[in-house]
Amino acid sequence: MKAFIVRMLLIFIGAILLIQLWIFSSLVWWRTHEVDTTMFMRIDYWSDPSEPIIHEWLDYDDISDNFKHAILAGEDAKFIHHHGFDWDGIRFALERNNEEGEVVAGGSTVSQQLAKNLFLYNKRSFIRKGQETVATWMMERMWSKRRILEVYMNSVEFGKNLYGVEAAAQYYYGKSAKSLTREQAAFLAALLPDPKYYQDHRNDRKLQYRKRVILRYMNSTQIPE
């Protein structure tokens, strides 16, 4: 019995180490190569292979600065200054959730969201959060802030099977993300908390309020050069 427990423990530790090696090697490759798929994209495809994934890569310099400012205003205003974790944001989210008695606010940074999108799944659990933390830590030490934001903008979800700002700009506005206006950029950034719902409810009051807030603060965000 003792030998069996030791063997199972070694298998578990080995599996954990293999996952970390996979994440590490993926981050090394993606540091200089386009990210053409993520775990979230795969999950969407596996759930319904008849629905194609809509995704198109766009280099950082070809994405409108309006969108870069908007996405940080909406998701992570301290992006430039933290090292993957916004402890003030996490503390605020915990306080909000404690007051409401349920999860109504997150504290995830762009880096944490990207780690989850690339390697994990959406269901909340302590195991997933722990792995997200490790992947975020590795990413922040291997990639520049510019690269993190570039990959994030190209892989985040904007609707059903719709990934990346270029695909979103073409879908919602029939134009490239290179020429997004402030209003258009703010709208796309405002979709992110619940893109599949807002895709069919574009006049939702919460969405419109979030868009106005992003417009108000987007010029105060600092983006990577």
Curated annotation (Swiss-Prot):
It catalyses: [GlcNAc-(1->4)-Mur2Ac(oyl-L-Ala-gamma-D-Glu-L-Lys-D-Ala-D-Ala)](n)-di-trans,octa-cis-undecaprenyl diphosphate + beta-D-GlcNAc-(1->4)-Mur2Ac(oyl-L-Ala-gamma-D-Glu-L-Lys-D-Ala-D-Ala)-di-trans,octa-cis-undecaprenyl diphosphate = [GlcNAc-(1->4)-Mur2Ac(oyl-L-Ala-gamma-D-Glu-L-Lys-D-Ala-D-Ala)](n+1)-di-trans,octa-cis-undecaprenyl diphosphate + di-trans,octa-cis-undecaprenyl diphosphate + H(+). GO terms for biological process: cell wall organization; peptidoglycan biosynthetic process; regulation of cell shape. Keywords: Cell inner membrane, Cell membrane, Cell shape, Cell wall biogenesis/degradation, Glycosyltransferase, Membrane, Peptidoglycan synthesis, Transferase, Transmembrane, Transmembrane helix. The gene is mtgA. Pathway: Cell wall biogenesis; peptidoglycan biosynthesis. One of its GO terms (cellular component) is peptidoglycan-based cell wall. It comes from Acinetobacter baumannii (strain SDF). Peptidoglycan polymerase that catalyzes glycan chain elongation from lipid-linked precursors. This is Biosynthetic peptidoglycan transglycosylase. It is found in: Cell inner membrane. InterPro entries: Glyco_trans_51 (IPR001264), Lysozyme-like_dom_sf (IPR023346), PBP_transglycosylase (IPR036950), Pep_trsgly (IPR011812). It is a single-pass membrane protein. Its EC number is 2.4.99.28. GO terms for molecular function: pentosyltransferase activity; peptidoglycan glycosyltransferase activity. Belongs to the glycosyltransferase 51 family. It comes from the Bacteria. The chain crosses the membrane at residues 9-29. The lineage of its organism: Bacteria, Pseudomonadati, Pseudomonadota, Gammaproteobacteria, Moraxellales.
